Amino acid sequence: LKQGSVLAFIALGLTVVLIAGGFDMSAGAVSQFATNLAAGTMIAGAGSAAALGLGALTGLIAGAVNAALVLIFGMPAFVATLGVMFVAMGATLLYNGGQALTLADQSGFFFIGQGYIGPVPFVLILLLVTTAILHFVLKRTRLGLRMYAVGQDLVAAELRGIGRARYATASFMLGGLVLGLAGVILASYSYGASALATGIDFLISALAAAFLGSTLNKAGELNVIGT
């Protein structure tokens, strides 16, 4: 359950981007970079709050860069996010020097990814809460409904006065936030960060989870609960 929950966070972040008609090849690499930054922050003695904040900021920045490349510079989402993936991979290798970052005893930080509340893994509780929040935002708020509208039929959305730029940017940044937090959780779960930089295994599994999850409703609509 704990290992699956970590992957589910990455899949949730990717699903948010897909809902608005985007695509994010950088999802796994960004999470892996956030994992390394979180591990390095803990090794430096900055504490769990700093690790969480840095992970979230990393994801937000990556989302903003992806949005800028797609919406301002007009690059295809696949190409833009592939470029960000390679940048994140390079940044990870530069940061960790190709070496695993292993944490010593950090009981408070380790609780995020490994702790239990009764018989239930704490990370599973975090996953359920995050899923509920995202479901509410995407299905019960104007922001979320317009993200769906842009993703499902851009022409119809624009005829109704719903511009693509604002809601596609929101999807990249919200998805990036979740991906950054996923990286922090992964650092907690795995006692640090591995020397790997690609995160490609996370990306493939997350894509599979998102698209298979769309089969849970008759419309074949992407949704965080299905993911």
Predicted regions mapped to residue ranges:
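Transmembrane alpha-helices
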Residues: 158, 163-187, 200, 204
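Transmembrane alpha-helical segments in multi-pass inner-membrane proteins
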Residues: 179, 190-227
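Transmembrane helix-bundle core of multi-pass membrane transporters
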Residues: 73, 77-140, 167-170, 189-198
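Membrane-helix/interface signature in polytopic inner-membrane proteins
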Residues: 133-173
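Alpha-helical transmembrane segments within multi-pass membrane transporters and channels
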Residues: 45-85
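Hydrophobic side-chain positions within alpha-helical transmembrane segments
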Residues: 37, 61, 65-69, 181, ...
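Single transmembrane alpha-helix segments in multi-pass membrane proteins
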Residues: 1-47, 68-75, 207-224
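Structural signature of hydrophobic alpha-helical transmembrane segments
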Residues: 1-7, 48-58, 124, 196-206
